[in-house]
Amino acid sequence: MPTRVLTMSARLGPLPQPPAAQDEPVFAQLKPVLGAANPARDAALFSGDDLKHAHHHPPAPPPAAGPRLPSEELVQTRCEMEKYLTPQLPPVPIISEHKKYRRDSASVVDQFFTDTEGIPYSINMNVFLPDITHLRTGLYKSQRPCVTQIKTEPVTIFSHQSESTAPPPPPAPTQALPEFTSIFSSHQTTAPPQEVNNIFIKQELPIPDLHLSVPSQQGHLYQLLNTPDLDMPSSTNQTAVMDTLNVSMAGLNPHPSAVPQTSMKQFQGMPPCTYTMPSQFLPQQATYFPPSPPSSEPGSPDRQAEMLQNLTPPPSYAATIASKLAIHNPNLPATLPVNSPTLPPVRYNRRSNPDLEKRRIHFCDYNGCTKVYTKSSHLKAHLRTHTGEKPYKCTWEGCDWRFARSDELTRHYRKHTGAKPFQCMVCQRSFSRSDHLALHMKRHQN
């Protein structure tokens, strides 16, 4: 303790100035800059004892003459030795080479020492609050949790799948991402979609396009609804229909591996039954179809024999009106919308048929007439209507009728003879004109 007191008192006493050649390199560079303008500010900035000794002591008086005591020599020696010790300067934050803002040279230090009062240094806030954009992205983690779009469900719901499937493979080790993407990475492991922390990640299969496979199943469904085996009491009919529909709808599933696991658990709430699927429900060509719509093609004499198999005697007009006003039974199988709606074939008449338009090459050259024909004979007969020529004369006695076309004369001649060559093969009714027979055949079809 006495030694420490002596040291403190010795420091307060006069000390000789050290020579300039023995100064440290750092203080040698700062000496032209510091000066003695504001001693209080220099004391706040430099906490080293050597700086205080170098700038704050008054000029030392000449030492007293006389012999020196050993304690005084020890104090003097210790003071001289303290000059060579490392001064305790404030710690300087370490900045990387590419982040140095100013050079560590003596020519730039003078900007930190100005005559203005206040903060002695222009404090760089980047030293105390570093910019995170210059840091490595791998060292910075976002505080916001990553939002994952994973639908989680308890494991107990899918217990039947874990029993029938093989145990899941062990999870793969975590794969490290590059540094520029590690800021977005979260602590997750690359594992198959199985049980993770008692949470099951549900794998939802895409919904199959039912309209693609419906045409192949429509015949079987229609056959199922029209078989007489379903006309049984409701107690057994319900379970049989449900099992059959289960098998029928299982054919629509594009993933056949999932059928044994899911088809047995669809109707768990229903009582078990021992109904076996009949052979007529197996995939085969259906034999029950709704009746096809009647053909609306006009009849002709050469097709009468072909239409005999499908025609019935025409009903009376009263029966026709009554059938249009009658209410159809909704339970009839014909009312089931089984077959996909197909557009009826487009029918053209003689004026709108595109095939006939291509073959119509004979134009009428009469002024203002736009008639076109496929045959030259038809055009010649048409030109007689413009010229008024009627070369075909009726040969019946006392008849002076003349016609421009031969078919018109033939039709007229039947009026004299009473011939009716066009006969209906269904009702045995005869007509003198073919168009009259075609109109009559439409009544049989309707």
Curated annotation (Swiss-Prot):
Residue positions of motif 9aaTAD: 107-115
Localisation: Nucleus
Zn finger (C2H2-type) location: 362-386, 392-416, 422-444
Residue ranges of the region described as Disordered: 1-22, 50-69, 284-310
GO BP, sorted A to Z: angiogenesis; cellular response to leukemia inhibitory factor; cellular response to peptide; intestinal epithelial cell development; microvillus assembly; myotube differentiation involved in skeletal muscle regeneration; negative regulation of transcription by RNA polymerase II; positive regulation of cell population proliferation
CDD domains linked: KLF5_N
Pfam families: zf-C2H2
Alphabetized UniProt keyword annotations: Activator, DNA-binding, Isopeptide bond, Metal-binding, Nucleus, Repeat, Transcription, Transcription regulation, Ubl conjugation, Zinc, Zinc-finger
MF annotations from Gene Ontology: DNA binding; DNA-binding transcription activator activity, RNA polymerase II-specific; DNA-binding transcription factor activity; DNA-binding transcription factor activity, RNA polymerase II-specific; MRF binding; RNA polymerase II cis-regulatory region sequence-specific DNA binding; zinc ion binding
GO annotations of cellular component type: Golgi apparatus; nucleoplasm; nucleus; transcription regulator complex
The keyword Metal-binding appears for this protein: yes
Tissues expressing this chain: Highest expression in digestive track.
Crosslinked positions (Glycyl lysine isopeptide (Lys-Gly) (interchain with G-Cter in SUMO2)): K31, K52, K83, K99
The keyword Transcription regulation is assigned to this record: yes
Function, as annotated: Transcription factor that binds to GC box promoter elements. Activates the transcription of these genes.
Complex and partners: Interacts with WWP1. Interacts with ANP32B; this interaction induces promoter region-specific histone incorporation and inhibition of histone acetylation by ANP32B.
Family stated for the protein in its record: Belongs to the krueppel C2H2-type zinc-finger protein family.
Protein name: Krueppel-like factor 5
Organism: Mus musculus (Mouse)
